[in-house]
């Protein structure tokens, strides 16, 4: 479990990628290779976090991300405290600050936080004084998803330098799109965000290494990886789309659209999928698909992040 040195101060949290240098990010991805080897063993466990307690504090429902983080912590021998807002004092009106201060009094060593409000993970970092990993805050950021996406692309090509990544779908409401738009250019990739004009947030247009387009063929042309995003209808108030069928007819990631990409281009999706809406079943299950590999890689990447923040000396 090695990591690069001389890469600047080691970040205390993973809230977004603002304080993370490319060298540190590559170190996390390098260490994920080692974690994948652990997951391939008959006994999938190492003592790296033995004696430490990780709290998964999820104020918003999650199955995949929460399970992935809890398994990642346990694979490294950490104790895991699982906090669900619906069964806690939060449902009785307790503030986020009071909840975190109580949990910290229980001697929790690190937090993995998901919250419906943008910036919530920053508040947890402020009030807990412990390392915090943002597992999704509103539509703002989901850094470990972006890291596992980057890792999956790097597995395919060896590097992200000079690669084109097209992300198609509901960009406006997607923390995954925002985190990838922040991360991938740091690692040398070009990012093209594509969707209907109503679902393209203009604030991302001026970001270095990022382009916006409403034309899916333009977005995918020459791409090395194409990511489909689901329509987050639970975050929409209406008026964004004429119809779901019209959206699928234009923006669905399918074999026809993928003909515009590089011949060896891969298909990604952060999940959960709405099959035959934003992605065809053929594309989701076909030879280009790396969707299940993303899930497998997620655990290794999250193990690497936990190691890096809690015990690594990168």
From Swiss-Prot:
Pathway: Pyrimidine metabolism; UMP biosynthesis via de novo pathway; (S)-dihydroorotate from bicarbonate: step 2/3. SUPFAM superfamilies: Aspartate/ornithine carbamoyltransferase. Carbamoyl phosphate binds at residues 64-65, 114, 142, 145, 271-272. Disulfide bonds: none annotated. InterPro entries: Asp/Orn_carbamoyltranf_P-bd, Asp/Orn_carbamoylTrfase, Asp/Orn_carbamoylTrfase_sf, Asp_carbamoyltransf, Asp_carbamoyltransf_Asp/Orn-bd. Its EC number is 2.1.3.2. It comes from the Bacteria. L-aspartate binds at residues 92, 175, 230. Keywords: Pyrimidine biosynthesis, Transferase. GO terms for molecular function: amino acid binding; aspartate carbamoyltransferase activity. PANTHER family: ASPARTATE CARBAMOYLTRANSFERASE, ORNITHINE CARBAMOYLTRANSFERASE, MITOCHONDRIAL. Heterododecamer (2C3:3R2) of six catalytic PyrB chains organized as two trimers (C3), and six regulatory PyrI chains organized as three dimers (R2). Catalyzes the condensation of carbamoyl phosphate and aspartate to form carbamoyl aspartate and inorganic phosphate, the committed step in the de novo pyrimidine nucleotide biosynthesis pathway. HAMAP family: Asp_carb_tr (MF_00001). Belongs to the aspartate/ornithine carbamoyltransferase superfamily. ATCase family. This is Aspartate carbamoyltransferase catalytic subunit. The gene is pyrB.
């Amino acid at each position: 479990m090695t990591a690069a040195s001389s890469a600047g101060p080691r970040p205390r949290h993973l809230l977004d990628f603002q304080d993370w240098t490319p060298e540190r990010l590559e170190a996390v991805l390098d260490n994920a290779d080692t974690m994948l080897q652990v997951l391939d063993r008959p006994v999938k466990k190492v003592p790296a976090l033995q004696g430490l307690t990780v709290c998964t504090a999820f104020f918003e429902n999650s199955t995949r991300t929460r399970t992935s983080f809890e398994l990642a912590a346990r694979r490294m021998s950490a104790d895991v405290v699982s906090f669900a807002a619906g069964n806690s004092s939060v449902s009785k009106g307790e503030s986020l600050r009071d909840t975190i201060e109580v949990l910290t009094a229980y001697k929790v060593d690190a937090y993995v936080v998901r919250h419906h409000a943008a910036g919530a993970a920053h508040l947890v970092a402020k009030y807990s004084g412990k390392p915090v990993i943002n597992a999704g805050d509103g539509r703002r950021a989901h850094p470990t998803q972006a890291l596992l996406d980057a890792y999956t692309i790097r597995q395919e090509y060896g590097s992200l330098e000079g690669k084109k990544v097209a992300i198609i779908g509901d960009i406006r409401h997607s923390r995954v799109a925002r985190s990838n738009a922040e991360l991938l250019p740091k690692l040398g990739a070009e990012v093209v965000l594509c969707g209907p004009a109503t679902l393209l947030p203009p604030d991302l247009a001026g970001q270095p290494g990022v382009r916006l387009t409403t034309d899916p063929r333009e977005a995918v042309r020459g791409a090395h990886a194409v990511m489909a995003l689901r329509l987050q209808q639970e975050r929409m108030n209406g008026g964004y789309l004429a119809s779901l069928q019209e959206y699928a007819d234009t923006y669905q990631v399918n074999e026809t659209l993928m003909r515009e990409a590089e011949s060896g281009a891969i298909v990604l999706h952060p999940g959960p999928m709405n099959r035959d809406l934003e992605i065809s079943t053929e594309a989701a299950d076909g030879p280009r698909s790396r969707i299940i590999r993303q899930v497998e890689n997620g655990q290794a990447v999250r193990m690497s992040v936990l190691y890096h923040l809690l015990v690594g000396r990168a």
